[in-house]
Amino acid sequence: AYGKALAANGQFEAALDAVRRAQTPEYPDWRLVSAEAAILDQLNQKDDARQLYRKALELKPNEPSVLSNLGMSYVLEGDLRTAETYMRSAAQQQNADSRVRQNLALVVGLQGRFDEAEKIASQELSPEQAQA
């Protein structure tokens, strides 16, 4: 939690240090691995971030939050097709939450498929919110 708070405050190096110190190498926690990946994404270390997202997925296969964050990593780079692949996989998981589905709607909309994006978004939102 401390590492995430530091990252939210823009203190990425301190956040990275906190997350790494909290990790137990013998029994890695997928949440900490994913948090470290997200921080590396913020530091524009995409390759290292994606490697860690994949490690988190090895520890917790098909975890929607990790798949979604991996997809967002590709969004930040402008690779919307790859991003959509990960986002769709995330959204199809039984335990996917609203944020995951909204991220899918975002990446579909960024590709100009507005009707499809609105349909995805409207599953969670009022019609007015989905059109916004």
Protein language model regions, located:
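Canonical tetratricopeptide repeat
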Residues: 1, 35-36, 69, 103
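Helix-start (N-cap) detector for alpha-helical repeat units in TPR-like alpha-solenoids
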Residues: 29-31, 64-65, 98-99, 130
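Structural marker of alpha-solenoid helical repeat scaffolds
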Residues: 25-26, 59, 92-94, 123-127
